[in-house]
Amino acid sequence: VKCGDLPLAKIIENTVTTEAVASFVDQLMDIDGSPSDDYEELTQVPVGVIDVGGKTTDCAVLLPGMMVDSSRSGSNDVGVLMLVEAVSAKLRAHLDLDTALPTSAIERALRTGSVKIYGKEQSVKEIVDEEKERLADQIMSAVRTKVGSGVDLDHVLFVGGGAIVLRDQLLKHYPHARVPDQPEFANARG
């Protein structure tokens, strides 16, 4: 690669992998680039990383020495934006509305479990919780086809914006899983 006559970089190898790997790297470093408190542990044991994004869920299994197990890593076309669509449809039917609620109202329902209809608060927590469970099950079914049961993994990390929205539902699937701080920025930081 050159800029004019000056070489900028000599690319020796290029590897394409899932965003989940970048999220793993994020867990290895502090904000200043120094090794995190978890660095030694995470680099010496098998770790699963599940990045629940808007449209896709990426997963990666990293083996000791930070080697990616490509047979257990990949991407699935199921993401947290499906929750907005599902809740919107359920609320429209449940509330007998002619048109769908605005996206902002659906997002509020996901956060608070309630919507305002004709100026009055209505609880929709049961519908939201049912749809969260359904989507988390769908996501985890897809993840298990790659990652497996997770019994052989020392850690499982849930990252991405979906890890915030579906935190409680996702953590039920792997007893040793955790959601790191600010999981929505994990792959960008990594």
Give the location of each predicted region.
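Short beta-strand scaffold segments in enzyme catalytic cores
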Residues: T57-V61
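Long, charge-rich alpha-helical interaction segments
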Residues: E85-D96
